[in-house]
């Protein structure tokens, strides 16, 4: 950065940086004292933003009068015009034209400015007290400053307490959503990811992005991901539509079903359509059910999705906070219209009704009566059982797809639909929903231009996970594996260090990706090696090669929210849990300081802390050591000490109505094992043979007790439950 001489005519002082755009040109100043070197003054580029006292948004005034006027016009409109049209797109154009005209007439889109007001509990006297404190700080009067600082803290807590009991406490029974929002505001726990500063450090190709250009840059990148994918062959889709016959009766949607679907839309969620908001659809469900029902039935009958349902507003959701790279730190979530969600819900029901007969038994994602916990139990049971033999070498491959949903090839997906013999109406509708989708990115109320996508299935829609589940359904291996939508885990068990079964599985994965036009993220794909023999050289096990890249071998890996380690202990996972909940003590402490009702704080503790400590506990509870179990119990003990400072732990449990965490985990394990014993459960096949003793006694086992050589296997979920006679 230094370009001027710093000693005589020579440049002897250097400053190196890879972020030169953030610094001004160094200023060369005279030397200090007797030094022969000039002083190099380097300053960062500081852009002073003029604080904006308001923000501008565009919204419609959907009050009672405007909604009533809209309803009256819709009731009197002759919808027979729409019913007599035989083209789905023409029906949609007429429907949206009528709705737009009526809504614009009674609730026009207006520009509204919102002032950045103070917090609702702040008063003028409190603001004056803050000014006096700041003046004392600037004057250097330490004693006066500390006195005013303490006074500010006391007054602030008092104002918050009064505000809670006068304005917030009553919302608990009236509007729990607003109650929870005010609770987070009072405790200072609002999500920082929702602020306007979330994307200030984003870079694309190493270049910082101007905030005004951010939506357009994001949209260009999201669309560029699909640049190398071939678009859908329209000839095949037209041939499929030409073979459409009469739609089956079970595909016909009733007006009452549409009415119920509209009534169950979430009014608190946004919609891509600024005319038909979810609030308007819910309020006018009885009026709009008939025309929307006709539109959905025509769409299914013709296998065509109207263009209005294929437009999405993309909201970039950070994977990390704050996000730094556009290429890897953002996830595009598509927000579609409310009517599109209703239509998707009916088609997804038809999809699942057919596909449930073909879905892979090792697929646990987005499938009825299956969850992440079931996938984790299947994998952990296999690992603990295999590790009981000291000669077994266990290798686990954790697969990560690169841009999994964005790279779905529509031509490949169409072939999968046909291969699984889906009804042609479902195929045509699903492919039409993906064909020539249009999206725009919205950031801070700034929208990019609309662009058309050639591939991918939108995240955030109801049909997106189903499409990917169909795509990956034929990905199978000759060894054990489990899938949760795009998270795939492969397990190899062998006694020979030279065994190549996992490498064969990796080669099979590469071939599948080549055939289905998918990509593996080899940087995030990991391998774990588990072995408990006395003499073992890890170097004897050849490294795994995937797409000509060597896969990194790790000691720990977080799979579906649970950390597995190479020694099959739960220490790393317990440390992860304790670290995660430690960040949330502050919320409990702040609410207790404000004098919030103890029962309310207990509810908040159960929601934000206890739920974390109990996630997938059926997998790891039985393998905890006494120390680990006590460490987890200490979290609840600490929270109850904050909420009930004058009570012992036992008395606090009694007053709050809570159980010990170890007792709750034990009950969860017992209930999970009872569910698995149902014959139609997805994990019923992991149970050992059922015993038929000649004499039934209190101490007999329902299942054959696994013979465990190690305490590790004896404390696994399955062996533990059988030994406990659950």
Language model segments and positions:
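Short, conserved micro-motifs composed of acidic
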Residues: 5-28, 248, 444-445, 504, ...
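Surface-exposed loop/turn segments and immediately adjacent short secondary-structure elements
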Residues: 43, 49, 82, 86-93, ...
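Short, charged alpha-helical motifs in flexible N/C-terminal segments and linkers
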Residues: 115-217, 251-296, 301-305, 314, ...
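Conserved catalytic palm subdomain of right-hand nucleotidyl-transferase polymerases, strongest
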Residues: 267-276, 314, 325-335, 373-418
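Active-site palm subdomain of RNA-directed nucleic acid polymerases
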Residues: 347-364, 387-388, 394, 465-492
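Conserved polymerase palm-domain catalytic core
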Residues: 399-484, 493
């Amino acid at each position: 950065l230094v370009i001027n001489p710093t000693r005589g005519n020579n440049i002897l002082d250097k400053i190196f940086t890879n972020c030169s755009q953030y610094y001004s040109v160094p200023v060369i100043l005279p030397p200090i004292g007797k030094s022969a070197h000039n002083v190099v003054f380097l300053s960062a580029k500081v852009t002073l933003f003029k604080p904006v006292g308001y923000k501008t948004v565009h919204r419609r005034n959907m009050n009672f009068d405007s909604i009533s006027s809209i309803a009256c016009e819709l009731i009197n409109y002759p919808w027979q015009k729409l019913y007599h049209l035989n083209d789905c797109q023409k029906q949609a154009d007429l429907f949206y034209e009528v709705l737009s005209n009526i809504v614009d007439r009674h609730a026009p889109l207006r520009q509204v400015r919102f002032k950045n007001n103070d917090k609702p509990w702040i008063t003028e006297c409190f603001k004056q007290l803050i000014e006096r404190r700041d003046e004392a700080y600037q004057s250097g009067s330490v004693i006066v400053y500390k006195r005013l600082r303490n006074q500010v803290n006391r007054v602030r807590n008092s104002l918050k307490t009064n505000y809670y009991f006068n304005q917030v406490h009553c919302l608990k029974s009236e509007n729990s959503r607003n109650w929870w929002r005010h609770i987070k505001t009072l405790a200072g726990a609002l999500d920082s990811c929702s602020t306007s500063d979330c994307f200030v450090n984003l870079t694309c190709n190493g270049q910082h992005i101007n905030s005004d250009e951010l939506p357009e840059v994001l949209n260009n990148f999201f669309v560029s991901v699909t640049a190398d994918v071939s678009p859908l062959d329209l000839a095949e889709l037209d041939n499929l539509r030409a073979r459409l016959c009469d739609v089956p009766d079970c595909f016909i949607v009733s007006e009452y079903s549409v009415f119920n679907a509209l009534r169950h839309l979430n009014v608190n969620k946004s919609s891509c359509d600024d005319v038909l908001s979810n609030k308007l659809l819910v309020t006018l469900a009885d009026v709009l059910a008939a025309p929307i029902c006709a539109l959905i039935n025509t769409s299914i009958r013709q296998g065509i999705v109207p263009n209005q349902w294929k437009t999405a507003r993309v909201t970039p959701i950070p994977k990390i906070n704050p996000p730094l790279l556009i290429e890897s730190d953002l996830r595009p979530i598509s927000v579609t219209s409310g009517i599109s969600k209703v239509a998707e819900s009916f088609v997804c029901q038809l999809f699942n009704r057919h596909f449930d007969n073909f879905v892979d038994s090792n697929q646990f994602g987005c499938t009825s009566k299956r969850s992440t916990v079931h996938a984790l139990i299947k994998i952990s049971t296999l690992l603990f059982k295999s590790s009981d033999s000291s000669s077994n070498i266990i290798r686990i491959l954790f697969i990560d797809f690169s841009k999994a949903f964005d790279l779905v090839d529509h031509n490949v997906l169409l072939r999968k639909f046909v291969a699984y013999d889906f009804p042609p109406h479902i195929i045509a509708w699903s492919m039409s929903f993906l064909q020539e989708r249009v999206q725009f990115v919205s950031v801070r109320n700034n929208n990019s231009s609309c662009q058309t996508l050639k591939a991918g299935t939108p995240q955030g829609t109801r049909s997106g996970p189903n499409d990917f589940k169909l795509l990956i359904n034929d990905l199978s291996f000759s060894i054990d594996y489990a899938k949760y939508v795009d998270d795939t885990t492969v397990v190899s068990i062998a006694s020979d260090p030279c065994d190549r079964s996992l490498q064969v599985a990796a080669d099979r994965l590469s071939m599948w990706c080549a055939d289905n036009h998918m990509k593996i993220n080899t940087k995030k794909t990991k391998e774990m090696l588990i072995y408990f023999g006395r003499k073992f050289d890890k170097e004897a096990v050849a490294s795994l090669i995937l797409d000509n890249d060597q896969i990194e071998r790790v000691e720990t890996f977080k799979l579906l929210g649970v950390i597995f380690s190479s020694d099959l202990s739960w220490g790393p996972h317990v440390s992860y849990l304790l670290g995660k909940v430690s960040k949330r003590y502050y919320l409990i402490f702040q609410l207790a300081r404000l004098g919030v009702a103890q029962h309310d704080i207990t509810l908040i503790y159960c929601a934000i802390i206890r739920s974390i400590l109990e996630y997938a506990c059926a997998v790891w509870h039985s393998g905890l050591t006494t120390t680990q179990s006590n460490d987890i119990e200490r979290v609840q003990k600490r929270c109850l000490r904050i909420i009930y400072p004058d009570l012992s732990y036992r008395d606090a449990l009694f007053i709050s109505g809570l159980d010990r965490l170890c007792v709750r985990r034990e009950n969860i394990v017992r209930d999970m094992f009872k569910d698995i014993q149902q014959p139609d459960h997805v994990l019923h096949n992991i149970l050992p043979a059922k015993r038929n003793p000649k004499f039934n006694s209190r101490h007999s086992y329902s299942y054959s007790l696994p013979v465990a050589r190690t305490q590790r296997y004896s404390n696994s979920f399955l062996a533990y439950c059988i030994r406990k006679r659950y």
